[in-house]
Amino acid sequence: MRFDVITLFPEFFATPLRIGLVGKALEQGIAEVHCTNPRDFATDKHRRVDDEPYGGGVGMVLKPEPFFAAVASLPRLDPCEIILLTPQGQPLNQALLQELAQKAQLILLCGQYEGFDERIRQHLATREVSLGDFVLTGGEIPALALINGVVRLLPGTVGKIDSLRSESFETGLLEYPQYTRPPEFQGHKVPPVLLSGDHRAIARWRLQQQLVRTWRRRPDLLAKRPLTPEEQQLLAEGLAEQHTDVEEQDRCL
């Protein structure tokens, strides 16, 4: 898969793209990332990529010519998306990452200053994506997040496919709690079921924990995911058990 990042700060991506699973995926050729500076396509002697907004206002607006020219200079693979990173865009979530992972090429437009000339938004970008309801100094951090999230879904990046299937959001639920050695630390014990060797009981416990954790932390996810009768029962039992545990802790205080 090919990523092309249109950015005024190509050096921003150097170190993050060399480390971890993403770095290994790039080394193995699973994906490739190319950075293009729109300043190289500026049309004046000062290589300006921004100008004052028509109608007045604060800040500077990114000009259309350098961005259109930068994108036009790129080789194209099909299917391709040209993504503008903006707080006004579609929220980046796991479902969108999975959709984008099916593309052959993603071109990411990183903004700076007061934002983009509207013609970039309307006539160049094919999609707008937001990292969340907050404003950053530029689109580079959202671009890194998107690249990371997509690359790890590409075949060969993550060793065990089951690792992806059991993660938060893959099944519409948050991930279950994880434990490792030692079995007891500072008086806090690993749940006995995880030490039992009973794989069916472990799977049931994990699903119950996912349901309870999602209900408590992200109830909006459950609103989008109808529960089976078994899941409804597991959720009710899990909530009841946690309520009992809280009451017992209160009595010990």
Curated annotation (Swiss-Prot):
Gene3D superfamilies: 3.40.1280.10, tRNA(m1g37)methyltransferase, domain 2. One of its GO terms (cellular component) is cytosol. It is found in: Cytoplasm. It comes from the Bacteria. One of its GO terms (molecular function) is tRNA (guanine(37)-N1)-methyltransferase activity. It catalyses: guanosine(37) in tRNA + S-adenosyl-L-methionine = N(1)-methylguanosine(37) in tRNA + S-adenosyl-L-homocysteine + H(+). It is an enzyme of class 2 (transferase). One of its GO terms (biological process) is tRNA N1-guanine methylation. The keyword Isomerase does not apply. Its EC number is 2.1.1.228. S-adenosyl-L-methionine binds at residues 111, 131-136. InterPro entries: Alpha/beta_knot_MTases (IPR029028), tRNA_m1G_MeTrfase_C_sf (IPR023148), tRNA_m1G_MeTrfase_TrmD (IPR002649), tRNA_m1G_MTases_N (IPR029026), tRNA_MeTrfase_TRMD/TRM10 (IPR016009). Keywords: Cytoplasm, Methyltransferase, S-adenosyl-L-methionine, Transferase, tRNA processing. The keyword Lipid metabolism does not apply. CDD domains: TrmD-like. NCBIfam families: PRK00026.1 (NF000648), trmD (TIGR00088). Belongs to the RNA methyltransferase TrmD family. HAMAP family: TrmD. Specifically methylates guanosine-37 in various tRNAs. Homodimer. This is tRNA (guanine-N(1)-)-methyltransferase. The lineage of its organism: Bacteria, Bacillati, Cyanobacteriota, Cyanophyceae, Synechococcales.
